[in-house]
Amino acid sequence: MTDTDPNFRFEGTFFETLGIRIVEATRERVIADMAVRPELMTIGGRLHGGALMSLADSIGAYGAFLALPQGAAGTTTIESKTNFFAGAAAGEVRGEATPLHIGGRTSVWQTRVTQKGKLVSLTTQTQMVLMPSPPRPERA
């Protein structure tokens, strides 16, 4: 990976551990693929719900990061809800995160995860905008 590859910034992170690969990333949409590997599956042979939620949270948070207002220090998830519609078998899933709201203090993102065009899960998450802490006064 190079620093022009959008996946470069995720080297050595949970994002990389999950095997998430960014396909497209703008403040209006983030698309990513994730391989459904044995270590992410349940004993029933389907992608674990926690892995689905982690994919959705990761790419929704990245979209929120890209949409941060000027001067913001970062973003963090403050609420997340996921509905599961189908199991995902071995292969690959695709997540597409889009904003429902982008404000000065929060943003709300919705992520659809599909496999071969079939809806697997739908996550809605709220991201809080983190502002830099004011400098602390020095003690005498």
Model-derived features: where do they sit?
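Terminal targeting signals and extreme-terminal segments of soluble enzymes
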Residues: 1-140
